[in-house]
């Protein structure tokens, strides 16, 4: 039993313009070298581009994209008797959102294009429609979990 107190889970703060936690989570993940103002600029430009492309509420597109990419289950390497098994584990909503944001940003960075705002907006629109690299990554993870379902009892 630990003698230290339990750590309270921090709630994500919301961003100054949209008052949205998901936007703030995106900003914190896109951040490089402590340049937060640049990260905010990239996200806000991407949101404007989404608005121009879809002519709908860009935050609903963002929510839909993250909901579409969020995995329900993932695999974790577990060493049992000298061999390593990929054990499927369920993922909580917070961890799932974090993974989804990471996958969306990774897919956006790999895209060819002019700038990050353009690439991110394209990836978010594609993910909201159900296509794109981030969606493919989620499906691949689910396939891995399904293939290794026999090892689920190793949890």
Curated annotation (Swiss-Prot):
It comes from Silene latifolia (White campion). InterPro entries: Ribosomal_uS7, Ribosomal_uS7_bac/org-type, Ribosomal_uS7_CS, Ribosomal_uS7_dom, Ribosomal_uS7_dom_sf. This is Small ribosomal subunit protein uS7c. GO terms for molecular function: rRNA binding; structural constituent of ribosome. GO terms for cellular component: chloroplast; small ribosomal subunit. PANTHER family: RIBOSOMAL PROTEIN S7 (PTHR11205). It is found in: Plastid, Chloroplast. HAMAP family: Ribosomal_uS7_B (MF_00480_B). The keyword Chloroplast applies. Keywords: Chloroplast, Plastid, Ribonucleoprotein, Ribosomal protein, RNA-binding, rRNA-binding. It comes from the Eukaryota. It holds the Pfam family Ribosomal_S7. Part of the 30S ribosomal subunit. One of its GO terms (biological process) is translation. One of the primary rRNA binding proteins, it binds directly to 16S rRNA where it nucleates assembly of the head domain of the 30S subunit. The keyword rRNA-binding applies. NCBIfam families: rpsG_bact (TIGR01029). The lineage of its organism: Eukaryota, Viridiplantae, Streptophyta, Embryophyta, Tracheophyta. Belongs to the universal ribosomal protein uS7 family.
């Amino acid at each position: 039993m630990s003698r230290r107190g339990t750590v309270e889970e921090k709630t994500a703060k919301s961003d100054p313009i949209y008052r949205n936690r998901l936007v703030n989570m995106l900003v914190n993940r896109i951040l490089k070298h402590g340049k937060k103002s640049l990260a905010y600029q990239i996200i806000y430009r991407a949101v404007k581009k989404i608005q121009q492309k879809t002519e709908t509420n860009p935050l609903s597109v963002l929510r839909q994209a993250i909901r579409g990419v969020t995995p329900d289950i993932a695999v974790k390497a577990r060493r049992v008797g000298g061999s390593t098994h990929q054990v499927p584990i369920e993922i909580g909503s917070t961890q799932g959102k974090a993974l989804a944001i990471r996958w969306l940003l990774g897919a956006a960075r790999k895209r060819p294009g002019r700038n990050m705002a353009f690439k991110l907006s394209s990836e978010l629109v594609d993910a909201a429609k159900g296509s794109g690299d981030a969606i493919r990554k989620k499906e691949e993870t689910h396939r891995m979990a399904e293939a290794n379902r026999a090892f689920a009892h190793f949890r």
